[in-house]
Amino acid sequence: TDILAHLRDWQICASIDGTGAVGEYIRTGLKWEQFLQNYKDAQAIQTNDRLMRLDFTLTLPGLFEVENMFWLSKELNTQILAKVTFAFSPDIVMSPLSLPRHILEPYVSSVLERIKPHADKHQQPLVDVLEQLLNRPTLEEQWPDEYADGMRRGKERILTLESIRTQPITMAEILKQNLEIYEWWNRIEVKN
């Protein structure tokens, strides 16, 4: 903020994938409390509310952060931009589209029921992305013949990364927040 205060024109889109430990899991190196304080410090010197935005990338573990991000946007009175993790092959298990339709749709719909009535112009982009997600083809629908093998490879990649990283939580622990999603994750068989 010591530099920003002396600039005439500036803008920050803070790329963030979640709050707290889940945000730190998704984006290695994030220190949530420090990020939040830095964001608030910069907000204190902004001259209008379009100078700072939260840029939220929706991931599979980030599904459990949608409501936290929504309410953070309200608390900070800041716009949240939103997009979904690219899903360009059937092994992108970090995409929420890796979930089968019968699991994805009710989960996203229930989140929308809770947040949509409270949305204003700052949260509407997040609501829009969630509504669009319901109409996008899942990985299983896009690659029916390759889906099972893709999920196996994607899960193996996640487990390999988790064995290297030093984070206190795992994908499985995050997904435990929803029994159906957790059971789906556990059914993905990996090679030993």
Outline where the language-model segments fall.
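Intrinsically disordered, low-complexity regions enriched in Ser/Pro/Gly/Gln/His and often acidic
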Residues: I3, K40, I103, Y107, ...
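Hydrophobic transmembrane signal anchors and adjacent membrane-proximal interface regions, especially
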Residues: N68, L72, A82-F86, L97-L99, ...
